[in-house]
UniProtKB/Swiss-Prot annotation:
Belongs to the PPR family. PCMP-E subfamily. Residues 616-647 are annotated as: Type E(+) motif. Its main location: mitochondrion. It comes from Arabidopsis thaliana (Mouse-ear cress). Residues 1-18 form a transit peptide. GO terms for molecular function: RNA binding. This is Pentatricopeptide repeat-containing protein At3g04750, mitochondrial. PPR repeats lie at residues 99-131, 132-163, 165-195, 196-230, 231-265, 268-298, 299-333, 334-366, 367-401, 402-432, 433-467, 468-498, 504-539. One of its GO terms (biological process) is RNA modification.
Amino acid sequence: MCFVLLLRRGFRLFGTECGSKTTKWDPVQSLQLNHQSLVLLENCNSRNQFKQVLAQIMRFNLICDTFPMSRLIFFSAITYPENLDLAKLLFLNFTPNPNVFVYNTMISAVSSSKNECFGLYSSMIRHRVSPDRQTFLYLMKASSFLSEVKQIHCHIIVSGCLSLGNYLWNSLVKFYMELGNFGVAEKVFARMPHPDVSSFNVMIVGYAKQGFSLEALKLYFKMVSDGIEPDEYTVLSLLVCCGHLSDIRLGKGVHGWIERRGPVYSSNLILSNALLDMYFKCKESGLAKRAFDAMKKKDMRSWNTMVVGFVRLGDMEAAQAVFDQMPKRDLVSWNSLLFGYSKKGCDQRTVRELFYEMTIVEKVKPDRVTMVSLISGAANNGELSHGRWVHGLVIRLQLKGDAFLSSALIDMYCKCGIIERAFMVFKTATEKDVALWTSMITGLAFHGNGQQALQLFGRMQEEGVTPNNVTLLAVLTACSHSGLVEEGLHVFNHMKDKFGFDPETEHYGSLVDLLCRAGRVEEAKDIVQKKMPMRPSQSMWGSILSACRGGEDIETAELALTELLKLEPEKEGGYVLLSNIYATVGRWGYSDKTREAMENRGVKKTAGYSSVVGVEGLHRFVAAEKQNHPRWTEIKRILQHLYNEMKPKLDCLDLLEIEIK
């Protein structure tokens, strides 16, 4: 408060003198002479020092001049953002005629507050200060909605700044791409008078980030045909696209292009690491290893890319070998290896020993990602005891209540069948975001507790948490698994007007499943064939085919299988299901022909298996391969003993006897 009064008194004291001809400061001359106050300002490193320099500037009668004030505001707003309050004070009280530099400085400083940014821009227009390209760039950075960027776009056109080169053109394309409006971005790009390599890169990178790899590649070929030479950013995006598409042929071509460009490109670590990642995404671990060995320089990211790549492919032996060779390991290295062993269902003791080596021997502190990796492994393999051990670690590390971890724990307990424990985790979570609510609703859905899921969905909205499209999918799944047809239809029909989401393929799939489970196959078929704005997925035709398994509608079953085979000809499920439907209605000839067609196309039935977690770890029992189990003789003896104990009490044990033999 005292400081504010001091500034105001200083302003009154020097207000009349600022207009005096004898004390008028010449900013050009003073800049050339390197005024001592400005020199001191550049060397400030604390708030108190800044106040002292400000007092000096007031003492030397520079407070009303534009240049020193612009330096003061820039220093307090940008160089040391913690002094933003002082910058605002100086701007409001001591800058009667701010120039474009001062306005840009303030707009940049308050970019986290959209309202303040646009308020400053309005003030700028009122004071007839012409904005430049930096002004519009800062405004776009503060914008979060498409409508705001479009308004800024209009102001840019009116200002004539688009004629100053490609800088603003590229910025507009970038922001439209980031907001997901590819149509407008493409139109802006098409109207650019002279697009350069940066312009093409903005489009290609935007497509690659959003997963539109084919569009990115098409634009790259247009760029080359227009005679524009790609740079390292273009090549980096191409490698990302090759990985997304698993296009090893194109990936090798890009690799060759890098090598032909010489050491400037081939020794670029960012490109080399992207190359390794691309090969792993194309499942070419041998080529990745060869490229890695050829690298003259390797950083931590290079080593981690190799470990993560082998983990993704399930080759834990190779991942461990690379891990052991690492000159230095960070948290990412340990997390990747822990995730790999957990996901593969390795012995719990192996995972725990690795965790203790990480925390006790190497003194690496685990984070949320570490815990989620361990929890996900327990969830995927149904290892409840391992999941409880990880839950204990979460509590001991004082991570309890974190929404991210709580969501993973809820998922784990639900998949292990302990829904009560999952609900307890949900209730004790101190942070409840939309992901946490969605996880609990999903768990209730898959346990057939549809009414509870709907009640929780209602409570979520009462507490002011806005559901997202994943939440709505979980609610539809809950209705489907519990036979709540009308409730599910109500949620689906109000997705747009009440929640602001257009139904996507997954939502339509859940709706079709809901109707099929309720026996309303004709309605489901009508939605798939006539009412959907997108192509039906295999899960939709699979739901319709499953609904016909009673044999009442053979024609619909045949239609569903025909459409299903167009989408996934290599899968055996449709063949087996239709064959069983024919058998149900006594059409054995058609049943046999369906099986023959399956064999003729080279489609093989994948053997099912069951998993049991024992003291020694995870055991898998594959159908028709029980005798290959290492302890089959012991298992058979115990089954025979159980059979002998049960036989005197039950009459219908013929089937069990056959299975044991």
